[in-house]
Swiss-Prot record:
This is Alanine racemase. InterPro entries: Ala_racemase, Ala_racemase/Decarboxylase_C, Ala_racemase_C, Ala_racemase_N, Ala_racemase_pyridoxalP-BS, PLP-binding_barrel. Keywords: Isomerase, Pyridoxal phosphate. Signal peptide: none annotated. It is an enzyme of class 5 (isomerase). One of its GO terms (cellular component) is cytosol. It comes from Chlorobaculum tepidum (strain ATCC 49652 / DSM 12025 / NBRC 103806 / TLS) (Chlorobium tepidum). Catalyzes the interconversion of L-alanine and D-alanine. May also act on other amino acids. The active site is at 50 (proton acceptor), 279 (proton acceptor). Its cofactor is pyridoxal 5'-phosphate. Pfam families: Ala_racemase_C, Ala_racemase_N. Substrate binds at residues 151, 327. Its EC number is 5.1.1.1.
Length: 383
């Protein structure tokens, strides 16, 4: 892939980058097509661009998805929405939903910026109606139902009363009802009961009012495993960025990684047997070997938990990471290989090396966290 333009996360001198995250918008488009092939043309797709689009750059991801016909976008909170709107001119018919339950002092920001607000309780609905009335404007809201995640949302038992309150508020416009699955990769049992609770709420509302409302529940795992949960709209996050929702599970959808996290070899040396590498001397050379130092550490997003667990790709060859990963640098055991030189590219995860899922398993975490951890000092480059 060749670089077409750059998104700088920090000012950098001319010359090769030390660490960079290559962002393939072509792979993003491919992944969207894979998702649409599953859901069908009648199902809307909400592009989840919270957390800076899982570290990929919310501005460029949103623009790419809009060009592919996506008009719904999800962010974590109102501040993420405002940042996106300041950096990108959204199309007139595009919508942003902020998932967080708002503080009362933030409600006017939703009105100012035209962001859809999540309502989880009566107090928020009443405050929103009062503020919207004072502004002389209508506020678009979506009801979040807690069917079993235990995080945000009204209980199914209280949902009908809250929906009646929203309906009675002339300055609130209900644009959707949604829920979130706790175990979306396991469609039977608890997840099936969550969906049943949710559909009971939405069905009762539509029967009582004679209105239809946008219903959405399926995140990446449910898109794959729960056809009945796709409803009117789906919310792909990790799947959109090319990772399977369960890192240990075989991929059933041919998505491609959108990010490649890579750095540079900045030093190579030969060490004798018994030489300890890095802090706390957690690894020692069993025999004479060559050690490469790479200019990326945990401050760049290469987790310390990967110490002595990860593998790194250099020149198409896989090498074990050795010693404790430090804040700014990582060491790799080259063995007797003498082909690696200073300046070579070292792929930490991506299409030319180990996957984010493989590294996540080695670190005892999930690919979501690895993608979101790639830090600001790593330059994002669109390819």
């Amino acid at each position: 892939m060749s670089a077409s333009h750059e998104q700088n996360s920090a000012a950098a001198p001319n010359g090769p980058n030390l660490s960079e995250a290559l962002i393939s918008l072509g792979n993003l488009r491919h992944n969207l097509a894979c998702i649409r092939a599953i859901t069908g043309p009648q199902c809307r797709v909400m592009g989840i661009v919270k957390a800076n689009a899982y570290g990929h750059g919310a501005t460029q991801v949103t623009a790419t998805l809009e060009a592919e016909g996506v008009r719904d976008f999800g962010v974590a909170n109102i501040y993420e929405a405002i940042e996106l709107l300041q950096e990108h001119r959204m199309l007139p018919d595009s919508r942003i939903l902020a998932f967080a339950s708002p503080l009362a002092g933030h409600i006017d920001l939703y009105l100012q910026h035209g962001v859809e607000m999540t309502v989880c309780d009566h107090e928020t609905a009443r405050a929103a109606e009062s503020i919207a009335a004072a502004c002389g404007r209508r506020l678009q809201v979506q009801l979040k139902v807690d069917t079993g995640m235990g995080r945000l949302g009204v209980t199914p038992e209280e949902a009908a009363e809250l929906l009646e309150l929203i309906e009675a508020c002339p300055n609130l416009e209900l644009t959707g009802i949604y829920t979130h699955f706790a175990e979306s990769d396991k469609p039977e049992g608890f997840t099936a009961r969550q969906l049943e609770r949710f559909l009971h709420v939405t069905g009762a509302y539509e029967r009582r009012t004679g209105k239809t409302v946008t219903k959405h529940a399926a995140n990446s795992g449910a898109i794959i495993s729960m056809p009945d949960a796709r409803l009117d709209m789906v919310r792909p996050g990790i799947l959109l960025y090319g990772c399977h929702p369960v890192d240990a599970a075989p991929s059933t959808v041919p998505v491609r990684p959108v990010m490649q996290f890579q750095s540079r070899v900045i030093f190579v040396k030969e060490v004798p047997a018994g030489t300890a590498i890095s802090y706390n001397r957690t690894w020692s050379a069993p025999k004479a070997t060559r050690i490469a130092t790479i200019s990326a550490g945990y401050a760049d997003g290469f987790h310390r938990a990967l110490s002595n667990q990860a593998r790194v790709s250099i020149g198409g060859k896989s090498f074990p990471q050795v010693g404790t990963i430090t804040m700014d640098q990582t060491m790799v055991n080259l063995g007797s290989d003498d082909s690696v030189k200073v300046g070579d590219t070292a792929v930490l995860f991506g299409w030319d090396g180990p996957s984010a899922g493989e590294q996540a398993l080695a670190a005892g975490t999930i690919s979501y966290e690895l993608l979101c951890s790639v830090s600001r000092r790593v330059r994002r480059i669109v390819v």
